[in-house]
């Protein structure tokens, strides 16, 4: 793989994760800027490496990344006496790892569609919360 392609993939993931992480940081969310960038860029780098190595078990490696990120997301859950908060944050961490993997594999169209769906979901969720719906 050409160096320019690797840089493009990593920078695209960095830039889009930066935007999302900045928005979360600005809104004082418990998990913000750094986490989303590091998770997605790390996943992207591992996907690039796996595809470069042509491993027979690269799918298993990528699956292990997604599973491992699930544990990181679980750390974002906050329990009070009668409620649990942070499911959207946990799911966001998980989907950003998948976003990074997909871009790392060179699936730009699919990655950008996922990124768009993430924003639509988060903005819709905020709208519903702000209007006490649900």
Which residues are covered by each model-predicted region?
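Hydrophobic transmembrane alpha-helices of secondary-active transporters
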Residues: 15-20, 70-78, 100
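Short, Lys/Arg-enriched charge-dense amphipathic segments
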Residues: 53, 75-82, 102, 132-134
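Membrane-helix boundary connector in multi-pass membrane proteins
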Residues: 79-85, 96-111
């Amino acid at each position: 793989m050409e160096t320019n392609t690797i840089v493009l993939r990593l920078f695209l993931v960095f830039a889009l994760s930066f935007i999302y992480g900045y928005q979360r940081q600005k809104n004082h969310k418990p998990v913000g800027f750094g986490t989303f960038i590091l998770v997605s860029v790390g996943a992207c780098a591992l996907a690039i490496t796996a595809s470069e190595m042509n491993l027979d078990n690269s799918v298993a490696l990528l699956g292990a990344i997604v599973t491992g990120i699930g544990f990181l997301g679980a750390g974002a859950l906050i329990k009070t006496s009668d409620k649990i908060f942070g499911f959207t944050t946990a799911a966001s961490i998980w989907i950003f790892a998948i976003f990074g993997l997909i871009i790392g594999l060179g699936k730009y169209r699919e990655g950008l569609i996922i990124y768009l769906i993430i924003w639509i979901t988060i903005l819709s969720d905020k709208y519903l919360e702000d209007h006490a719906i649900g």
